[in-house]
């Protein structure tokens, strides 16, 4: 019988051999994409400036995931940390990409083999000779194997016992490096920003998975539960698998968008909440005050601020500033950052310090307003000059830079002061090269934004898929008129559909 496009997957419904084949082919496609994408990113990635042009500014998507798992060197002689001439051995970025492509090829061949040799003895019950799969037993096997892999990752790879460790950094994303991590078994292990929780949770979840797998291998489900949850129906497996996947997708969308130890800002860029809360601005202010307390001059205190920290405190690195349909890397938007101009301090003609009010995340334009330390408006760039009372010219605002390339330089020309006031709305001021990439000046999101949007969207779609297939398997007799206890293999390509005269409906 002919199948409409949206029902073509039913051809593998009662065909375990070809069900395996299509899943292996899917793995081949996923692995092949990952390896190919890694090679493409490596071809276009510029590792020369890890401070002002890091991977996330360049739109790298798979390189950050390799890096957080312990890969940091290239066969090209560069390292993500800025070192040169290192010898990474086989596990370089290119080595990982090549391994994925080789694995993809092997999966491709295995998929073809399983498609051709689909009617294997292992799929038949030796006592009856009828096709049958022991799905609870298969569940136990998969649970045991995934538990073992989970435990191995936490106990060996993350801890450095047999592996490199993972990417660990400080709260401000300045000192990140690959290092072994000790498991955190106390309450701190539940803090999403504590790397030790990654090790301890993988170890604990792995042990639980191994024990649960052994349980399901050794204990049969009660008949009432087996029938009630349709454990003999492969669509039950599909439904529960989709549930696991959409749940995981929602979780990682959250850990990516809100930030966690698994999504370091050095690899994926800052989160929008760090801009909203003035996170880096407060740390910079704390460091400057500490410098002044040590009798440093204002210029010396600002000059000690790491350029990396200042760059985080710039709205162009906020992943929520890029529209969902603005394709391309951050560098294609506001340009490639070249250097920090320094911190501008504005003063009125009486010498009182003024502060530019920063632009909130969801504004494209925002009035230029300068306030005093009590938050009272003292100067602005007016929309209507005729009614202006607080214009830069009237208030006599000047600006002087501390730290950065313009350290010690001051400006009194109102046009220049207004230019830097507008730029100070966006955080620390950087020189940006828009010519090299023909950047259009419109902000882009970082890989953090793309990952979150993609996973949240697919999680929602998969949630509906879980409901759909769960309902189909639980109410198969209602929807298709097929006895739920029917376990006979039916004609190839004609499965369990309403109005299909070839599908057997009753057990007897």
UniProtKB/Swiss-Prot annotation:
Indicate the family of this protein: Belongs to the PsbB/PsbC family. PsbB subfamily.
Q: Which Pfam families match?
A: PSII
Residues that span the membrane, as ranges = 21-36, 101-115, 140-156, 203-218, 237-252, 457-472
How is this protein organized at the quaternary level? PSII is composed of 1 copy each of membrane proteins PsbA, PsbB, PsbC, PsbD, PsbE, PsbF, PsbH, PsbI, PsbJ, PsbK, PsbL, PsbM, PsbT, PsbX, PsbY, PsbZ, Psb30/Ycf12, at least 3 peripheral proteins of the oxygen-evolving complex and a large number of cofactors. It forms dimeric complexes.
Instruction: Kindly give the Gene3D superfamilies that the UniProt entry links to this protein.
Output: Photosystem II CP47 reaction center protein
Q: Which GO terms describe its cellular component?
A: chloroplast thylakoid membrane; photosystem II
Q: How is the cofactor bound?
A: Binds multiple chlorophylls. PSII binds additional chlorophylls, carotenoids and specific lipids.
As one GO molecular function, the record gives: electron transporter, transferring electrons within the cyclic electron transport pathway of photosynthesis activity
Q: What is this protein called?
A: Photosystem II CP47 reaction center protein
Q: Which organism is it from?
A: Cryptomeria japonica
Q: Please spell out the taxonomic lineage of the organism that makes this protein.
A: Eukaryota, Viridiplantae, Streptophyta, Embryophyta, Tracheophyta
**Primary subcellular site in the record, as a coarse category:** plastid
Per UniProt, what is the membrane topology?
Multi-pass membrane protein
- What subcellular locations does the record give? Plastid, Chloroplast thylakoid membrane
- What is the role of this chain? One of the components of the core complex of photosystem II (PSII). It binds chlorophyll and helps catalyze the primary light-induced photochemical processes of PSII. PSII is a light-driven water:plastoquinone oxidoreductase, using light energy to abstract electrons from H(2)O, generating O(2) and a proton gradient subsequently used for ATP formation.
The GO annotation for biological process reads: photosynthetic electron transport in photosystem II
Under InterPro entries, the record lists: PS_antenna-like, PS_II_antenna-like_sf, PSII_PsbB
Print the keywords alphabetically. Answer: Chlorophyll, Chloroplast, Chromophore, Membrane, Photosynthesis, Photosystem II, Plastid, Thylakoid, Transmembrane, Transmembrane helix
